[in-house]
Amino acid sequence: MISYWSQGPADENMPESMLVDTLARVRQHPWWSARARLALALLRAHGIHPPASILDVGCGWGVNLETLEAARYPVTGLDISRQILELIDLPDRRLIQADLNQGFPPGHELYSGMLLLDVIEHLDDDRGTINRLAPLAEPGAVLIVSVPSLPELFSEFDVIQGHRRRYLPDTLRAAFDGTGFVVEKIFWWGSWMVPILRRMRQKHTTAIPRTFADYLHLPPWPAPLLMRALYVWEHQRALAGSLRTGSSLFAVARREP
């Protein structure tokens, strides 16, 4: 069921056709499933267990929703794209159409946990977005944010997706200033991808422009199996904060009482 809060120009954040056209491919890609498992582990590690309610902000293709539903969390997905919400809608799934650049209606539910995974890099005002989300979080709620990292890796792939920026730990921490959330930890993820992305960036500097689907194309087997194994290998290291670099950064923050 889709509830309506507000609408806005979805294509300004990420081309809506890209979301729709790549749904099947994303749901099979190891990166999205590994990220969802990491977010689930973070919720558990910070004391957020069912029946605590979760809001997945920028739920997109629904990979996080499936992971949390399988873990028996009552979860709601929020996205600006009506088209993608209609594609992932299920009779017992709770979805909200809303524009993060606008305020939210009164009388809404308060959530114990919130996911904001690879969202704020699409928005001009990252801090303002987090600040607007604060009233949706109950006191002590956990907010998990992920972003693409290392500005020197900014490439055509970022442009295609509608990314405004890539982050460093300090710039990610600054996005929480004055928002009502206190950052508890920031850590790297995807360290094994960094040299690959560096090579890809150099290779495609003068190449023919590519599409989002081109970048999502998985290499032949057994490469996808190897990718899954690398994410499993890195999972605990990322959670422990022992990685020294990565293609992504995660932040875990707590709503002030």
Segments (PLM) and residue ranges:
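Conserved S-adenosyl-L-methionine
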Residues: 181-191
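Conserved N-terminal segment of class I S-adenosyl-L-methionine
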Residues: 1-117, 127-130, 216-220, 224, ...
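C-terminal helical/coil "lid" or tail adjacent to the Rossmann-like core of SAM-dependent
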Residues: 193-228
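Feature marks short, surface-exposed loop/turn motifs that line or immediately flank catalytic pockets
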Residues: 84, 104, 151-153, 192-193
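A short glycine-rich, Lys/Arg-flanked "PGG" loop and its adjoining helix->strand segment in the class I
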Residues: 127-142
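Short, glycine-/aromatic-enriched active-site segment of Class I SAM-dependent methyltransferases
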Residues: 23-25, 143-165, 169-174
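A short His-aromatic
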Residues: 118, 122
